[in-house]
Amino acid sequence: ESAMQSVKGKKAVMIIAQNNFRDEELLKPKEVLEKNGVIVTVASSSLKESTGMLGAKVKPNILFTNINVADYDAVIFVGGSGASEYWDNPTAHKIANDANNAKKLVGAICIAPVTIAKAGLLTNKKATTYSSTVNDIKSAGAKYTGADVERDGNIITASGPAAAQKFGETIVKALSE
């Protein structure tokens, strides 16, 4: 109950790929956040309807290029095969760095930790990622732990769809602190 009070009205933005975001990695954390009173905005590289790998259809609220980090308490990068569109994207890197520099919560799940790793956020930080992208985050300086969900300060990473629920719960807990 107390955690619910403390996160009520906080704001999170979840960044999804235009195509092939991973359904549960958006929908499960979003549900957990909203159930706890967090206001969630969905952002993507297009305002057209986005399609998940398993067929979920989601209409983004805003373009990710229009994200103003100051408006949010948490910035969350959602995974799925399409998430690689942000790996080398300078705007995605700027959003990650702006959020980190402002001590906002930064979350990334599945292959999305590569985006924040390439932005420089995971250097000497404990982190996890999807099995196929372990070397990508290690080469960017991350200390890979292999955990389902890993937290190092304001940065929360998760390994994939099976960890989506726990990822959401960990974000809520961090927002309540």
Locate the predicted segments by residue:
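Extended, subdomain-level signal for the structured scaffold at the beginning of enzyme domains
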Residues: S2-A102, V106, T115-L121, V134-G146, ...
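Catalytic nucleophile serine of serine hydrolases
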Residues: C110
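Anionic-ligand binding patches
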Residues: A127
